């Protein structure tokens, strides 16, 4: 056991985590050169296309150190994006140490900081690594100082390496062996295994990634899932060397995968504890803190026949992604679907794209909203995650919106732009600290403003140098209203949005103008209106297409033309009463463009 090292790699987006993992695998001979590909661990197509890590991946490598001993390294490559911070905290729970990878050109960024603090809170040994020292812009001395000043860990003798060229990777491995402590645990105690992650395999059923804290797990053992109390037989178990390799036993301190033939998706939830069915442990391990979704959106299948498949797909996906929340929802405009909760906009895009690709579904998404706390006049408290659930105006005492605490790290040259942006987003400054050339600014900004496009705007005003980390702080009373959209006088529930009263006029106007672009012209006028309660605040009209009925009249009497026009007018009127307006998917996404221009 003293030869096992469990660690995660944490870093900001694009600081070279996945490339470093590739090098570690190569040096330790986890894969032959023929099988080696760039970013081996980013196994999803989506990850490769976007160049980001979405799911944490684990690998077990054997490394022969300079002291002649062979060590078993279990490491977990984690995502760097703020939306997937939950994946990171889960991975860290399975480790004793973390490599903090910092780009020697760019220095410390907000996400580095957030993940590093998570690691320190969990009492992990944090080992700083300066990556990309082969770049001409690299300045390891400055960055080492920055790490000491901003993060507060000793970094003067931080290992320097270039994951791309392979320079210094041996030193990184030696450092892991010497600096990261061996796992603690009692091999003779009853089995306790923490489920770090699970996914659904069509042939094997549920596959779980586990970290053995105490005891050991063997093939054909009878095990029990603590939360459900169900017992299963272990069919197969093993490790990843990135490839799935079968073994006969997983010992204390090891990380590996287990298949127990569980077919029910909720059979082995992430964060749960496995123990032996006979003489097992009676105490579960402390799991993970549950994350609350920050953004909610309705997802509806385009054809209602897909509803069952959609439900199964969501079930399988939520097994793999513990932070996804969903419940059935019914909309007058879109039929049956689900209200889903996500950690952020990127998370939402990724989930939608995975559902469409992996499960072959066609989906319509409604505009995302955050959760509001609503106090009714009779004192009842509601949590509203969809504009349709907001009570009538005269039943509401006050609406409180969620406020996010945003930590932004930005070079001092771009500070002005960032402050302007935060103020425009109704932010309040909490703190500002200068660290050399970097400034750490803290703002309290309404979650609704942060979630939509704050990240993109922040990147563009600071030319990509600013970085952001945010978390939910509190609910605060605010003057929020619901803007409804009416098409020919009928409310479309899926198009409503909740916004601040000061911005409701502009948002309403932008929304109807945007909708006008997306709704195709029909044989009758379509009036698009935005309303707060019964008060119409904006309107635009999609003009009808009309046939030129008087084309066949040559000269002749004007009353003849009038008669034809009148007849056409009556026909249009009749049509308007019975006609339906077809809404394309783009019209539902028009809300997303509101407030961007």
From Swiss-Prot:
Its main location: membrane. GO terms for biological process: positive regulation of translation. GO terms for cellular component: plasma membrane. It is found in: Cell inner membrane. Residues 2-184 form the tr-type G domain. The keyword Transcription regulation does not apply. GTP binds at residues 14-19, 131-134. GO terms for molecular function: GTP binding; GTPase activity; guanosine tetraphosphate binding; ribosome binding; translation elongation factor activity. Keywords: Cell inner membrane, Cell membrane, GTP-binding, Hydrolase, Membrane, Nucleotide-binding, Protein biosynthesis. Its EC number is 3.6.5.n1. It catalyses: GTP + H2O = GDP + phosphate + H(+). Gene3D superfamilies: 3.30.70.240, Elongation factor 4, C-terminal domain, Elongation Factor G (Translational Gtpase), domain 3, P-loop containing nucleotide triphosphate hydrolases, Translation factors. Required for accurate and efficient protein synthesis under certain stress conditions. May act as a fidelity factor of the translation reaction, by catalyzing a one-codon backward translocation of tRNAs on improperly translocated ribosomes. Back-translocation proceeds from a post-translocation (POST) complex to a pre-translocation (PRE) complex, thus giving elongation factor G a second chance to translocate the tRNAs correctly. Binds to ribosomes in a GTP-dependent manner. This is Elongation factor 4. The gene is lepA.
């Amino acid at each position: 056991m003293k030869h096992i090292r469990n660690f995660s790699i944490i870093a900001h987006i694009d600081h070279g985590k996945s490339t470093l993992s590739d090098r570690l695998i190569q040096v330790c001979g986890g894969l032959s050169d023929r099988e080696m590909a760039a970013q081996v661990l980013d196994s999803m197509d989506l990850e490769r296309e976007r160049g980001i890590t979405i799911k944490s991946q684990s690998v077990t490598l054997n490394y022969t150190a300079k002291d002649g001993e062979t060590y078993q390294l279990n490491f977990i490559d984690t995502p760097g994006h703020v939306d997937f911070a939950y994946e990171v905290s889960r991975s860290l729970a399975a480790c004793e140490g973390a490599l903090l990878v910092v780009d020697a050109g760019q220095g410390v960024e907000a996400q580095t900081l957030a993940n590093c603090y998570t690691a320190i809170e969990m009492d992990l040994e944090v080992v700083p690594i300066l990556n990309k020292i082969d770049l001409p812009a690299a300045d390891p001395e400055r960055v080492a100082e920055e790490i000491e000043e901003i993060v507060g860990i000793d970094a003067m003798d931080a290992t320097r390496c270039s994951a791309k060229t392979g320079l210094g990777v041996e030193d990184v491995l030696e450092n892991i062996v010497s600096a990261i402590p061996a796992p603690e645990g009692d091999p003779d105690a009853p089995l306790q295994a923490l489920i770090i992650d699970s996914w659904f395999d069509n042939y094997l059923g549920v596959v779980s990634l586990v970290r053995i804290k105490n005891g050991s797990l063997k093939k054909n053992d009878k095990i029990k899932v603590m939360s459900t109390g169900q017992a299963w037989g272990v069919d197969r178990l093993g490790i990843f060397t990135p490839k799935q390799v079968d073994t006969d036993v997983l010992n204390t301190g090891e990380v590996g995968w287990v298949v127990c033939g569980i077919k029910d998706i909720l059979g082995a939830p992430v964060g749960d504890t496995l123990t032996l069915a006979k003489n097992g442990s009676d105490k579960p391990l402390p799991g993970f803190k549950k994350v609350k979704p920050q953004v909610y959106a309705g997802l509806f299948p385009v054809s209602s026949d897909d509803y069952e498949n959609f439900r199964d797909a969501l079930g399988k996906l939520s097994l793999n992604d513990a932070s996804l929340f969903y419940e059935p929802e019914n909309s007058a405009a879109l039929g049956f679907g689900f209200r889903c909760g996500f950690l952020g906009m990127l998370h939402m895009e990724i989930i939608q794209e995975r559902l469409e690709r992996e499960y072959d579904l066609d989906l319509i998404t409604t505009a995302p909203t955050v959760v509001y706390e609503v106090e009714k006049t009779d004192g009842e408290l509601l949590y509203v995650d969809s504009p349709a659930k907001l009570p009538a105006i005269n039943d509401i005492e006050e609406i409180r919106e969620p406020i996010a605490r945003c930590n932004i790290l930005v070079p001092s040259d771009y500070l002005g732009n960032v402050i302007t942006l935060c103020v425009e987003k109704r932010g309040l400054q909490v703190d500002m600290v200068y660290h050399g050339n970097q400034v750490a600014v803290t703002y309290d900004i309404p979650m609704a403003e942060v979630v939509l496009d704050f990240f993109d705007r922040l990147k563009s005003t600071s030319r990509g140098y600013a970085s952001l980390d945010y978390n939910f702080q509190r609910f605060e009373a605010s003057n929020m209203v619901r803007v409804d959209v009416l098409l020919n006088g009928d409310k479309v529930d899926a198009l409503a949005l909740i916004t601040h009263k000061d911005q409701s006029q502009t948002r309403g106007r932008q929304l109807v103008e945007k909708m006008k672009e997306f709704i195709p012209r029909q044989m009758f006028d379509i009036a698009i209106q935005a309303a707060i309660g019964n008060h119409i605040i904006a309107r635009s009209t999609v003009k009808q297409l009309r046939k030129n009925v008087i084309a066949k009249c040559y000269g002749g009497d004007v009353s003849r033309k009038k008669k034809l026009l009148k007849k056409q007018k009556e026909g249009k009127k009749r049509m308007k009463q019975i006609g339906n307006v077809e809404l394309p998917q783009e019209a539902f996404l028009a809300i997303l463009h509101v407030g961007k221009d």
